[in-house]
Regions:
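Core catalytic DNA strand-manipulation module of type IA topoisomerases
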Residues: 1-168
Length: 168
């Protein structure tokens, strides 16, 4: 039988993600969908050219309020895949003080990548994936920090030591 020799509980907060710059979008698309960076850049450029997203070749991780958060969110409300997410963001702050998580990198010429709110219509499978990543990240940057916990247990079994770790 095992004996628990130590339990360590660590509480912490996990901040919302920062807005996408091109590199961040490429990493996420590769991780989530195995889409290579060159293809991601090409798809993002195509989405930009039909006014679905902002300029994609940016290094900025900042979304200035002047882009009109609330207006974009209202437009996204009309897209069937995002209605509930949009409502949650708008309910978050009833005083029109929407706050976004901001990254460190800034590009004076262009803000981070964001959806324009225009209806995407028919997109290819990969275009839809990239567009969804951008929209979902846009929603996520308005989130509150999540409360997380790490639990580490040390177990002793027949003279052997085992560590078990769990994140909640």
């Amino acid at each position: 039988s095992a004996v628990v020799s130590n339990i360590d509980i660590n509480n912490y907060t996990h901040k919302p993600p920062v807005p996408f710059n091109l590199t961040g979008l490429q990493k996420e698309a590769s991780s989530q969908f195995n889409i290579n960076p060159k293809t991601t850049q090409s798809i993002a450029q195509d989405l930009y050219e039909v006014s679905l997203i902002s300029y994609p070749r940016t290094e900025s991780q900042k979304l200035p309020p002047k882009i009109g958060y609330k207006n974009i969110l209202k437009k996204l409300k009309n897209q069937e895949n995002y209605t509930e997410k949009e409502k949650k963001v708008l309910k978050k702050d009833k005083h029109d003080n929407l706050y976004t998580q901001q990254g460190k990198k800034e590009d004076d010429a262009h803000p981070a990548i964001y959806p324009t709110g225009q209806n995407p219509g028919n997109l290819s499978k990969n275009e839809r994936k990239i567009y969804d990543l951008i929209v979902k990240r846009f929603f996520a940057v308005f989130g509150k920090a999540a409360k997380r916990q790490t639990l580490t247990m040390t177990l002793e079994v027949n003279g052997y030591t085992f560590n078990a770790k769990s994140k909640v």
